[in-house]
Amino acid sequence: MIEKNKLRSNLKNLDYKDFALSEINIKFLNTLIHQKKVCTYIPNKMEININNYLVSFSELQTTYLDDDMLNICLLNEPFVENKYKIAEPAIKIPVTDTQVFLIPGLGFTKEGIRLGRGKGLYDKLLSKYSTALKIGICAKKNLLDEIPMKEHDILMDYVLTENENFKIH
């Protein structure tokens, strides 16, 4: 079985500028998140920007880092970079009513296992929201046959690529 660090190294240099969800998956995503409190992410250069598909939402949420823990706040500008060089809102208005998480990852399996950056930040956050819908977003080229799973890893409910979607449970 391949190590997670080797997988991360292989996936960190991929280019996502041409990524686009198919019309079918845009509709599918909007069906899943319609009229729900959605926490999305502010993409970095290694993550897919799906936020332009979420323009109909007047109030989106996102994550921010506080004492090495992810928390949730309203998505608003301007952005600042945290200590890991990840953008987050400069003004944090905390929220706790999240119903759906749109989650980036370096890779996913069709079984919902996520390969993150190795700090377990999303796993710790998601463990507090067991009833929330968890949707992993990745390019098809980041769909992996297997990712080693640890006890604390949280499975996704769905994984979406450009043209495919996988319901996990």
Residue ranges and their predicted role:
Residues 71-169:
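Conserved phosphate- and dinucleotide-binding cores of soluble alpha/beta proteins
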Residues 1-92, 96:
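N-terminal active-site beta-alpha-beta segment that forms phosphate/nucleotide-binding
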